Amino acid sequence: YHYDSPHWNLSVQADVYQNKIENRIVCLPLKGTYTWSMMNYGYTFCRGLNATAQGRYNSADWMFSLLGTLTWQSDVNRTDPDDEDTYNKPICYSPALSSGITSVIGWRNLQLSTSYLYVGERMWSYADPEDVLTPYNNIDMKLTYTHHIGKTAVGACLEVCDLLDEQYEHIPRYPMPGRNYKLTLTFGI
């Protein structure tokens, strides 16, 4: 669905999918966090739903934008029906549920954006069904100012990553950095 007017844009989209993949190559940290190994899944089966909703408002000085995404999927190994340890088990590092929300508020040359990300449980090994990475949430914020002097654009951006300082791991025993800050200055001709 899509709606347009002079000030508003709204859209909603949902896709249902099913994939059967032969010889799927996945890169996994099987020999430590710095040495990744290529793994060939002979046959995988994936089905899921992607949904996106987006809204935007524009006026002379103001801009508001909101984007939401949701993905649910069942992504399983169907290589060897006789292998109880791996058959019909989730593909490593493939979450069943993930979602995100991004909001942007702009006023003239100033813009504040916030993004929220949720990643659900995901297995990281077939060796033990308890080898599950816990779900995590992440919130980032960014404040941007841009000023034009003739044809030259000068800008500054202050970004706070992992605003709530939540500790999480993309791969086992390798925690992502906590809250951190970035300042970016730009000059464009």
What role is predicted for each listed range?
Residues 6-21, 37-122:
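Gram-negative outer-membrane beta-barrel transporters
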Residues 28-37, 77, 81-90, 129-134, ...:
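Flexible, surface-exposed loop regions and adjacent strand-edge segments
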Residues 36, 96-100, 136-140, 178-182:
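Transmembrane beta-barrel architecture of outer membranes
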